[in-house]
Amino acid sequence: SLPSGGMDNRTAYTTGRYPGYSITNFAPFLQNSYDINDIFTLSGGVRYQWTENRVDDFVGYAQQQGIATGLANSADTIPGGKTDYDNFLFNAGILAHLTDRQQTWFNFSQGVELPDPGKYYGNGTYSLVGDHYQLQRSVNVADSRLEGIKVNSYELGWRYTGDSLRTQLAAYYSTSDKSIIINRSDMTINVQPDDRRIYGIEGAVDYFIADTDWSLGGNFNVIKSEVKQNGKWQKWDV
């Protein structure tokens, strides 16, 4: 009772904030590598990613509160449903064996940013008619399909593997050119141009103490994220 100040807390009502949903992914891929010579190795592949979203019917959060507090007795549901989208994703890289203990590499890969259905679907505008909430407009599966946002990533790295010392350093850069927003005027989901980038440097060092089970190590990651606004890159808070 100490956290509640000695009061006996009771649940008045329970509401849901977002519609229930499930996500199914299917992603077959092909990947291969080829040794050009003793120094260089090429690698590459392709992946097909298919995603299906199933969303439950849902009553708006504010309308659930209104029913729970007695302001209304019932409400229309925002219809659920299912939608799917797919992407072909590619990757390629080259690895160079500088010495028996040192390697450097450059990789390009594509990923897909999967939107959260609960963040977009289940939004609606209602009007109270008598003791019933009538649905006017809504963001629903039938009217607005989500799609994956493709992300291109690049990485340049180097590593050293010694008997006791192991270290690695890599620079990375990733870009995307779209984002998903809700148009509140007509309650639809829009995919709009939106240039964003994330880049940084990361590294790690490990030292294994001889004749013991102990090791010392450390790592770091310096990252910066930016979004293009009015033709200029600005800080992007993520």
Please annotate each region the language model reported.
Residues 1, 45-47, 107-109, 168-172, ...:
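Transmembrane beta-strands of outer-membrane beta-barrel proteins
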Residues 1-5, 54-63, 117-123, 130-131, ...:
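Outer-membrane beta-barrel translocator domains and adjoining extracellular loop/strand segments
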Residues 1-102, 114, 129:
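Signature of Gram-negative outer-membrane beta-barrel scaffolds
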Residues 12-19, 31, 71-81, 139-144, ...:
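Extracellular loop and loop/strand-boundary signature of outer-membrane beta-barrel proteins
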Residues 18, 28-30, 90-92, 144, ...:
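Membrane-embedded beta-strands of outer-membrane beta-barrel proteins
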Residues 30-35, 40, 86, 94-97, ...:
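Residue-level signature of outer-membrane beta-barrel architecture
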